Protein backbone atom coordinates (compact mmCIF):
# COMPACT_ATOMS: atom_id res chain seq x y z
CA UNK A 1 0.00 0.00 0.00
CA UNK A 2 1.39 3.36 -1.03
CA UNK A 3 1.93 6.04 1.60
CA UNK A 4 2.01 8.76 -1.06
CA UNK A 5 0.35 12.02 -0.15
CA UNK A 6 -0.39 14.81 -2.57
CA UNK A 7 -1.43 18.22 -1.27
CA UNK A 8 -3.01 20.95 -3.35
CA UNK A 9 -4.14 24.30 -2.00
CA UNK A 10 -6.36 26.96 -3.56
CA UNK A 11 -7.74 30.21 -2.25
CA UNK A 12 -10.13 32.99 -3.14
CA UNK A 13 -10.54 36.52 -1.76
CA UNK A 14 -14.19 37.35 -1.17
CA UNK A 15 -15.47 40.90 -0.77
CA UNK A 16 -17.56 39.96 2.25
CA UNK A 17 -17.05 39.38 5.98
CA UNK A 18 -15.64 36.03 7.09
CA UNK A 19 -18.91 35.22 8.88
CA UNK A 20 -20.82 35.56 5.60
CA UNK A 21 -18.45 33.14 3.85
CA UNK A 22 -18.66 30.67 6.75
CA UNK A 23 -22.46 30.81 6.84
CA UNK A 24 -22.77 30.33 3.07
CA UNK A 25 -20.36 27.40 2.82
CA UNK A 26 -21.59 25.63 5.96
CA UNK A 27 -25.19 25.70 4.67
CA UNK A 28 -25.09 22.59 2.50
CA UNK A 29 -28.25 23.67 0.68
CA UNK A 30 -25.96 26.14 -1.15
CA UNK A 31 -23.55 23.44 -2.36
CA UNK A 32 -25.21 22.73 -5.75
CA UNK A 33 -25.17 26.44 -6.61
CA UNK A 34 -21.41 26.84 -6.36
CA UNK A 35 -19.79 23.37 -6.40
CA UNK A 36 -21.06 22.67 -9.91
CA UNK A 37 -18.39 20.12 -10.85
CA UNK A 38 -18.62 18.17 -7.59
CA UNK A 39 -22.31 18.38 -6.63
CA UNK A 40 -24.75 17.24 -9.30
CA UNK A 41 -27.47 16.70 -6.69
CA UNK A 42 -27.87 16.72 -2.91
CA UNK A 43 -30.04 15.09 -0.27
CA UNK A 44 -29.69 16.47 3.25
CA UNK A 45 -29.29 13.90 6.05
CA UNK A 46 -28.43 14.13 9.74
CA UNK A 47 -24.94 15.66 10.12
CA UNK A 48 -24.43 16.30 6.41
CA UNK A 49 -25.67 15.32 3.00
CA UNK A 50 -25.58 12.63 0.37
CA UNK A 51 -24.11 14.26 -2.72
CA UNK A 52 -24.45 12.94 -6.23
CA UNK A 53 -20.93 13.48 -7.56
CA UNK A 54 -19.56 12.53 -10.98
CA UNK A 55 -18.24 9.31 -9.37
CA UNK A 56 -21.59 8.46 -7.74
CA UNK A 57 -23.24 9.09 -4.39
CA UNK A 58 -21.11 10.00 -1.40
CA UNK A 59 -21.37 11.52 2.05
CA UNK A 60 -20.40 15.19 2.47
CA UNK A 61 -20.46 17.24 5.64
CA UNK A 62 -18.77 20.11 7.41
CA UNK A 63 -17.51 20.75 10.92
CA UNK A 64 -16.13 23.99 12.19
CA UNK A 65 -15.96 27.00 14.42
CA UNK A 66 -17.36 30.25 13.00
CA UNK A 67 -15.41 32.48 15.40
CA UNK A 68 -12.09 30.82 14.49
CA UNK A 69 -12.80 30.58 10.75
CA UNK A 70 -12.28 26.82 10.77
CA UNK A 71 -14.57 24.94 8.39
CA UNK A 72 -13.51 21.43 7.48
CA UNK A 73 -15.07 19.48 4.64
CA UNK A 74 -15.63 15.75 5.12
CA UNK A 75 -16.27 13.51 2.13
CA UNK A 76 -16.27 9.79 1.47
CA UNK A 77 -18.37 6.76 0.69
CA UNK A 78 -19.98 7.00 4.16
CA UNK A 79 -19.80 9.39 7.10
CA UNK A 80 -17.65 6.87 8.98
CA UNK A 81 -15.13 6.64 6.11
CA UNK A 82 -15.11 10.34 5.23
CA UNK A 83 -11.76 12.09 4.81
CA UNK A 84 -11.10 15.68 5.85
CA UNK A 85 -10.15 18.61 3.65
CA UNK A 86 -9.34 21.52 5.96
CA UNK A 87 -10.56 24.95 4.93
CA UNK A 88 -9.96 28.28 6.63
CA UNK A 89 -11.66 31.66 6.43
CA UNK A 90 -9.45 34.57 7.48
CA UNK A 91 -10.72 38.15 7.74
CA UNK A 92 -8.65 40.63 5.72
CA UNK A 93 -10.13 44.02 6.54
CA UNK A 94 -13.70 43.93 5.20
CA UNK A 95 -12.82 41.00 2.95
CA UNK A 96 -12.13 37.30 3.53
CA UNK A 97 -9.42 34.93 2.42
CA UNK A 98 -10.92 31.45 1.96
CA UNK A 99 -8.33 28.68 1.64
CA UNK A 100 -9.05 25.04 0.77
CA UNK A 101 -6.43 22.33 1.29
CA UNK A 102 -7.02 19.23 -0.83
CA UNK A 103 -5.45 16.01 0.43
CA UNK A 104 -5.03 13.08 -1.93
CA UNK A 105 -3.22 9.80 -1.87
CA UNK A 106 -1.12 8.68 -4.82
CA UNK A 107 -3.76 9.62 -7.41
CA UNK A 108 -4.81 13.25 -7.98
CA UNK A 109 -7.99 13.45 -10.08
CA UNK A 110 -7.51 15.16 -13.44
CA UNK A 111 -8.60 18.81 -13.61
CA UNK A 112 -9.39 18.93 -9.87
CA UNK A 113 -7.54 22.23 -9.42
CA UNK A 114 -9.25 23.81 -12.42
CA UNK A 115 -12.65 22.59 -11.24
CA UNK A 116 -12.22 23.80 -7.67
CA UNK A 117 -10.85 27.12 -8.90
CA UNK A 118 -14.03 27.59 -10.96
CA UNK A 119 -16.16 26.56 -7.99
CA UNK A 120 -14.41 29.02 -5.68
CA UNK A 121 -15.08 31.75 -8.26
CA UNK A 122 -18.77 30.75 -8.14
CA UNK A 123 -18.71 30.88 -4.35
CA UNK A 124 -17.15 34.36 -4.44
CA UNK A 125 -19.77 35.63 -6.89
CA UNK A 126 -22.70 34.20 -4.91
CA UNK A 127 -21.52 35.39 -1.48
CA UNK A 128 -20.73 38.87 -2.80
CA UNK A 129 -24.14 39.08 -4.50
CA UNK A 130 -25.86 37.98 -1.31
CA UNK A 131 -23.91 40.50 0.76
CA UNK A 132 -24.68 43.25 -1.77
CA UNK A 133 -28.38 42.43 -1.56
CA UNK A 134 -28.22 42.43 2.25
CA UNK A 135 -26.42 45.78 2.31
CA UNK A 136 -28.96 47.30 -0.10
CA UNK A 137 -31.93 46.14 2.02
What are these regions (language model features)?
Residues 74-137:
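Beta-strand/loop substructures that line and gate deep hydrophobic ligand-binding cavities in soluble
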Residues 10-12, 40, 47-49, 60, ...:
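Residue-level detector of beta-strand structural context in well-folded domains
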Residues 7-9, 55-60, 81-86:
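Short, surface-exposed coil-to-beta transition loops
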Residues 1-43:
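Hydrophobic ligand-binding cavity/cleft-lining segments
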Residues 15-19, 63-68, 89-97, 125:
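A short, structured loop/turn motif at beta-sheet edges
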Amino acid sequence: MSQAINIRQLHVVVDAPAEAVFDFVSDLRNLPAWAVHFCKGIRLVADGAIVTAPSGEMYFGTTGDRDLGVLDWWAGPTMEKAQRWPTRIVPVGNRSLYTVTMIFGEHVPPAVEQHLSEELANLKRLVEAREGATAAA
